[in-house]
Amino acid sequence: MERIPSAQPPPACLPKAPGLEHGDLPGMYPAHMYQVYKSRRGIKRSEDSKETYKLPHRLIEKKRRDRINECIAQLKDLLPEHLKLTTLGHLEKAVVLELTLKHVKALTNLIDQQQQKIIALQSGLQAGELSGRNVETGQEMFCSGFQTCAREVLQYLAKHENTRDLKSSQLVTHLHRVVSELLQGGTSRKPSDPAPKVMDFKEKPSSPAKGSEGPGKNCVPVIQRTFAHSSGEQSGSDTDTDSGYGGESEKGDLRSEQPCFKSDHGRRFTMGERIGAIKQESEEPPTKKNRMQLSDDEGHFTSSDLISSPFLGPHPHQPPFCLPFYLIPPSATAYLPMLEKCWYPTSVPVLYPGLNASAAALSSFMNPDKISAPLLMPQRLPSPLPAHPSVDSSVLLQALKPIPPLNLETKD
């Protein structure tokens, strides 16, 4: 039975056939040649596997080193200049990494500090909201402080209005003293102080009118009304109702208004001195002074008669001196046609309707030797009192002819 060749070598126990040669068994490979061929093939396979393993490993290592070098180059470019200047020469990879680590630590500390500040601010805002000190409370405190300061300033100026050498340093010192009193918790004002407060707030809106208007020098006695009204007197002069605050003088009778009218005459000079200290370019108009002097002799007409006249317009408290003096024509005789058409049928004199005198007294009053020029200005409409006799227009014409031009006196 023939032996089938296999891939394994023959066992050593079997003896080798002596007569077998290569030519004896055609188509059969000898065992020793098969073993040699097999060993060479295994060695070649192992070498190829090692080469194929080394090739991708080298590529991977090369790529990894390239990535590391690229990242280090980018870090070197991103480093601040002051860190680059700390080292001289070429920056090595290790130096670049150290500087990067130092810079990152500094940035981390800065971010931590900012976060702590933000947290502190947020906690402070929450505490402020809880305490109730919001924007509205601050506005109310500011308004109250401003009003207190303005009240103190006006009261101080009212007390020292007659003092001509008043300085701003004195006012500032007074305000500092009041502030110290308020901070200490003491009583700052007395109960009797609201009266000068009202007077000062009335003087405040009237002060710009006397300094801004050119022909408003005739309206200077508006301060006299506030001064007399704040002192508790109901003055009967025609300057009591300049802003509509003196309308109470209408309710008084004729007897109660005459002493106030006379007392106001004595106050005119002190107020004129005060106005002269403030406004130096123009003095008190002499027309007011003449009217006050005449009031002692002819104290029959009052401001209530002048105010109650409908000639003033719809507002009964409008000041009687608001009619500019320069609008009056040079001669009062120009009003004669109007007097004949409108006022002649009524039996009331034209000049001052409050004069309760007879026709003889009126003719004596119309005498140019006794009358003053400012009184001849046509002031008001007649009152409907039928007790006076009728006056002829010839008498009025005779009384009005010797009047000098009024515009020449008002220029003084």
Swiss-Prot record:
Please outline how this chain is modified post-translation: Ubiquitinated; which may lead to proteasomal degradation. Sumoylation inhibits its ubiquitination and promotes its negative regulation of the CLOCK-BMAL1 heterodimer transcriptional activator activity.
Per the database record, which ranges form the bHLH domain?
A: 52-107
Q: What is the effect of changing residue 279 to R?
A: Partial loss of sumoylation. Complete loss of sumoylation
Q: Which domain of life is it from?
A: Eukaryota
Question: Where does the UniProt annotation locate this protein?
Answer: Cytoplasm; Nucleus
Basic and acidic residues compositional bias, start-end: 248-271
UniProt keywords (A-Z) are: Biological rhythms, Cytoplasm, DNA-binding, Isopeptide bond, Nucleus, Phosphoprotein, Repressor, Transcription, Transcription regulation, Ubl conjugation
| Any one annotated GO CC term | chromatin
**InterPro entries per the UniProt record, alphabetical:** bHLH_dom, HES_HEY, HLH_DNA-bd_sf, Orange_dom
Query: Quick one: where's region Essential for interaction with BMAL1, E-box binding and repressor activity against the CLOCK-BMAL1 heterodimer?
Result: 1-139
| Tissue occurrence | Expressed in cartilage, spleen, intestine, lung, and to a lesser extent in heart, brain, liver, muscle and stomach.
Glycyl lysine isopeptide (Lys-Gly) (interchain with G-Cter in SUMO1), cross-linked positions: 279
Q: Which residues form the Orange domain?
A: 142-175
Any one Pfam family here would be HLH
Crosslinked residue numbers (Glycyl lysine isopeptide (Lys-Gly) (interchain with G-Cter in SUMO1, SUMO2 and SUMO3)): 159, 279
For the region Necessary for interaction with RXRA and repressor activity against RXRA, what residue ranges are annotated?
75-79
Supply one GO molecular-function term.
DNA-binding transcription factor activity
Q: Where is this region: Disordered?
A: 182-303
> What mutagenesis or variant effect is reported for residue 58 to A?
Loss of repressor activity against NR0B2
GO BP, one annotated term: negative regulation of DNA-templated transcription
UniProt crosslink position (Glycyl lysine isopeptide (Lys-Gly) (interchain with G-Cter in SUMO2)): 167, 279, 288
Quaternary structure per UniProt? Answer: Homodimer. Heterodimer with BHLHE41/DEC2. Interacts with TCF3/E47. Interacts with ubiquitin-conjugating enzyme UBE2I/UBC9. Interacts with HDAC1, SUMO1, RXRA and BMAL1.
Annotated function: Transcriptional repressor involved in the regulation of the circadian rhythm by negatively regulating the activity of the clock genes and clock-controlled genes. Acts as the negative limb of a novel autoregulatory feedback loop (DEC loop) which differs from the one formed by the PER and CRY transcriptional repressors (PER/CRY loop). Both these loops are interlocked as it represses the expression of PER1/2 and in turn is repressed by PER1/2 and CRY1/2.
What's this protein's name? Class E basic helix-loop-helix protein 40
Q: Which organism is it from?
A: Homo sapiens
